[in-house]
Amino acid sequence: MSDSDAMTDPNAVSYSNAIVVLCTAPDEASAQNLAAQVLGEKLAACVTLLPGATSLYYWEGKLEQEYEVQLLFKSNTDHQQALLTYIKQHHPYQTPELLVLPVRDGDKDYLSWLNASLL
């Protein structure tokens, strides 16, 4: 969808303040626990857990391969720093994956719900 299409589509919102934070957890139990804590603090409106991820990376000079659960935290820029700080403080990893992706466009009803859920 082009920018001009987004302007004419009544269900699209351009240049929202929504973000998606990517994070991995070592297992489903810790992923569910972290997701529930973040939702309880209203730092994210929704968290999607994607089990079955395999991550390969170097840690302390050694190639590691781990089963992980990918988490997708849906939030907004107003809550971004608090969300990142909270995850870092409550995550079982010493250095958790924390990547922030801006949401450029989206359905206006979903984005309205997302923002209302974070108030």
UniProtKB/Swiss-Prot annotation:
InterPro entries xrefs: CutA_Enterobact, Ion_tolerance_CutA, N-reg_PII-like_a/b, N-reg_PII/ATP_PRibTrfase_C
Cofactor(s) essential for the protein: Cu cation
Keywords, ordered alphabetically: Copper, Cytoplasm, Metal-binding
Residues binding Cu cation, per UniProt: C23, H90, H91
Superkingdom of this protein's organism: Bacteria
Any single GO CC term annotated in Swiss-Prot or TrEMBL for this entry: cytoplasm
Note accompanying the cofactor annotation: Binds 1 copper ion per subunit.
Compartments (UniProt record): Cytoplasm
Cytoplasm is among the record's keywords: yes
GO BP terms in the entry: response to metal ion
Recorded GO MF terms: copper ion binding
Pfam families in the record: CutA1
Role summary: Involved in resistance toward heavy metals.
Sequence similarity: Belongs to the CutA family.
Quaternary state and interactors: Homotrimer.
Protein name: Divalent-cation tolerance protein CutA
Upper classification of the organism: Bacteria, Pseudomonadati, Pseudomonadota, Gammaproteobacteria, Enterobacterales
